Design a protein with these regions (language model features):
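Short, charged/polar surface micro-motifs in flexible loops or helix N-caps
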Residues: 44-46, 69-72, 325-329, 373-376
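DNA-contacting surface of Y-family translesion DNA polymerases
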Residues: 1-2, 31-32, 40, 207, ...
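Short acidic-glycine loop/turn motifs at beta-strand connectors
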Residues: 99-101, 142, 323-326, 377
């Protein structure tokens, strides 16, 4: 059995409790440690971790990052808040009922994207096969990298985690396995600051006693349907023939059969997964006036732009989303001549759609996004017709640099200030 220290990377004796070189208790041991190459890395409570990094007084306090109003939602909760049951996407009023002493912080996407970009760069130093899932998580295929770096994938990931702690100031959790399904599952087993391994020899047995919900993508509706048929654990799926599962559940049944047997043929795809980038907010009170909606739209466009720039993408389509006071959703899409990642262009495009929708109807939610993503090298070419577009683009990129260095509120456009006054 192979074993090493996650702190100094020194090899360790199997069964040892402490590193003989540095004294660390963080030893990792597994029979397949030297051969597994598919990793999933997830930043621990990312937004909250960045806020705690920048404000040491928050270190031991329950921190919630999200909309500051009771009608908002939780973006991220730190692990102290999670002890009280607070979870991402939970309504803020519910989170504060569970954790009334929580410190609520509005998101600072300029800060988060700067950290994400730094981490992404570190990943790419190890392998070009990095598939981002969001700002704070990604798959890595480290096959063949040992010849380049002189370390097995497991040690490369441990070294990466340590480097992120030192240079970015946050912790990450890592899962290592032989396919994406199990690597992601492994990364969730030992949070925070964890490193878990699921080998090929143990995978099917490991899954056997796990609830069906452990299968990524088996949502509440599918779980309820399976439970109605008496299927609550993965082992029950393993015991069924593929043809019986297909007959009962169609293609979903075959998908369940493969994953229950630890089979996942998906490759780590640097261009995969990310299909759109969006941001939305729920208002404290319903808004009907165009001018008020316009100010909120700018703030959301800035957030989408920041995420797009961090991911290295732009979008060919701008999408506006509105939800009425009666919970009816309106979605409008506008196609562009060339993809964009600029907040100004996203805002101007969505504003025209908003102008047509702002007919006196009271809205409780507004969102904007981009889809049909393209690499940032294809985004925002010089506009020979609109002389002002180049100046606006240059101004925006200058503002990005200031915000990344001094924080998201270092430079605020008039539109954003009006948005803050109206909230």
């Amino acid at each position: 059995m192979s074993a090493f220290c996650r702190d100094c990377l020194a090899d360790a004796r199997a069964g040892a409790k402490r590193c003989a070189t540095c004294g660390s208790l963080r030893l990792l041991a597994h029979d397949e440690l030297d051969s597994l190459a598919i990793a999933h890395m997830d930043c621990d409570a990312f937004y909250a971790a960045i806020e705690k990094r920048d404000n040491p007084e928050l270190r031991d306090k329950p921190v919630i990052v999200g909309g500051g109003s009771r009608r908002g939602v939780v973006s991220t909760a730190c692990y102290v808040a999670r002890i009280d049951g607070v979870r991402s996407a939970m309504p803020m009023f519910k989170a504060l009922e569970l954790c009334p002493k929580a410190v609520v912080i509005k998101p600072n996407f300029a800060k988060y994207t700067a950290a994400a970009k730094a981490i992404r760069g570190m990943m790419l130093e190890l392998t070009p096969q990095v598939e981002p899932l969001s700002l704070d998580e990604a798959f890595l295929d480290l096959s063949g990298t040992q010849m380049l770096h002189g370390l097995a994938p497991a040690k490369l990931m441990a070294r990466l985690a340590k480097r992120i702690e030192i240079e970015v100031g946050i912790t990450v959790s890592i899962g290592l396995s032989f396919n994406k399904f199990l690597a992601k599952l492994a990364s969730e087993l030992d949070k925070p600051r964890g490193f878990a391994v699921i080998g090929e020899a143990e995978a099917v047995a490991f899954l056997r006693d796990k609830p069906v919900g452990f299968i990524r993508g088996a949502g509440a509706a599918l779980q309820a349907r399976l439970a109605k048929d008496g299927i609550t654990h993965i082992g029950q799926i393993q015991d069924m023939a593929a043809k019986d599962l297909a007959r009962r559940y169609g293609n979903t049944g075959l998908w369940l059969h493969h994953l229950a047997h630890a089979q996942d043929s998906r490759k780590v795809d640097p261009d995969g997964e990310l299909k759109s980038i969006s941001s939305e907010t729920t208002f404290d009170t319903n808004i009907a006036k165009f001018e008020d909606l316009e100010a909120v739209l700018w703030r959301q466009a800035e957030r989408v732009s920041a995420r797009a720039k961090a991911s290295g993408h732009g979008g060919r389509t701008v999408v506006l989303k509105l939800k009425t006071a009666g919970f009816r959703t309106r979605t409008r899409s506008v196609s562009l001549d060339s993809p964009t990642q600029l907040a100004d262009r996203i805002f101007r495009t969505a504003r025209e759609a908003l102008r047509r929708e702002a007919d006196g109807t009271a809205f409780r939610l507004l969102g904007v996004g981009i889809s049909q993503l393209a690499p940032d090298t294809d985004c925002d070419p010089a506009d020979l017709v609109d002389d002002g577009s180049a100046k606006r683009a240059a101004t925006e990129r200058a503002m990005d640099k200031v915000r990344a260095k001094f924080g998201g509120e270092a430079v605020v456009k008039g539109r954003a200030a009006r948005s803050a006054l109206r909230r």
